Amino acid sequence: MKALIFAAAGLLLLLPTFCQSGMENDTNNLAKPTLPIKTFRGAPPNSFEEFPFSALEGWTGATITVKIKCPEESASHLHVKNATMGYLTSSLSTKLIPAIYLLVFVVGVPANAVTLWMLFFRTRSICTTVFYTNLAIADFLFCVTLPFKIAYHLNGNNWVFGEVLCRATTVIFYGNMYCSILLLACISINRYLAIVHPFTYRGLPKHTYALVTCGLVWATVFLYMLPFFILKQEYYLVQPDITTCHDVHNTCESSSPFQLYYFISLAFFGFLIPFVLIIYCYAAIIRTLNAYDHRWLWYVKASLLILVIFTICFAPSNIILIIHHANYYYNNTDGLYFIYLIALCLGSLNSCLDPFLYFLMSKTRNHSTAYLTK
């Protein structure tokens, strides 16, 4: 189990380097980034789509495809398909999604602020407190950036805050998800060691272990989020007359296979491996506690709340992430991206649910279980 945890952490730290080296080694275009984020497709005004001559009536020659012609200079003004315009102007994008973000903001900001206050002033310095503090900080940072996302959607998906803030908001938006996932996995591993291997756990330098682990989580997430901050995120759409943030990319940007590897590795190491670890940890915890004392079942129910939050908030978006980018890479279509945006909106609920997880655990802690959270 320990070897698996260390191997997963090592791969998490090394994979961003591989992705970055893939971006640097593309010889087709050394002046531009080679890892465009696959959102809705947008084409510059003076480009045209591929067209097979075999589609012409009466054509009897060989099948020839005219490749897309792109301008040599980088374009900030793009055209999008009617389906994309329909989503960007729909009630789903301009009313429902901002309404959910508003709910997360209204509940999440005070809830995480109170959680941080309790962790700093009402709770002793213990291992789990370090993890919960970092989780609350990540959620609070996410919640305070939501007003920009809310204004963006209410304004018809028109971004008015500039490129730098667009990139920063995107980094925090995605970074919170994977930071929360990794921290919830760390909390699960901590409980697994405390309950299943109590003697080993008591001999660990728990406070140092928690601080180092949280530092590695933040560093790993930061490295993985670098492409979102390096690449251009803001594009002006000619037809709807709006400026999008992250939702549209230029199809004429140079591309490489590393874009697919990057997002698959992001979902695999940022979601699947932590998910498997959480299932393993809680299965072992339930088996251990149930074997000794059925009165522990109330604690098991509280612990399973992490698994519920994990499954509802993070599973849909990461599963759709893999399918969307595989579909985009092999079929060059972006039809699943709007479903991915809905799943991301659902995932944002995690930021207002995490504080209640801490409140629940603080209420259920007593003298007989205190050693589990030290």
From Swiss-Prot:
Signal peptide location: 1-21
Disulphide bond pairs: C166-C245
Tissue: Highest expression in the megakaryocytes of the bone marrow, lower in mature megakaryocytes, in platelets and in a variety of other tissues such as heart and gut.
Membrane disposition: Multi-pass membrane protein
Any GO MF annotation of the entry: thrombin-activated receptor activity
Stretches assigned to the Extracellular side: 39-94, 149-167, 231-260, 323-336
Highest taxon of the lineage: Eukaryota
Family the UniProt entry places it in: Belongs to the G-protein coupled receptor 1 family.
Proregion span(s): 22-38
Protein name: Proteinase-activated receptor 3
Cellular location(s): Cell membrane
Post-translational modification: A proteolytic cleavage generates a new N-terminus that functions as a tethered ligand.
Keywords, sorted A to Z: Blood coagulation, Cell membrane, Disulfide bond, G-protein coupled receptor, Glycoprotein, Hemostasis, Membrane, Receptor, Signal, Transducer, Transmembrane, Transmembrane helix
A cellular component term, taken from the record's GO annotations: extracellular region
Organism: Homo sapiens (Human)
SUPFAM superfamilies noted in UniProt: Family A G protein-coupled receptor-like
Alphabetized InterPro entries for the sequence: GPCR_Rhodpsn, GPCR_Rhodpsn_7TM, Prot_act_rcpt_3, Protea_act_rcpt
GO biological process, one term: ligand-gated ion channel signaling pathway
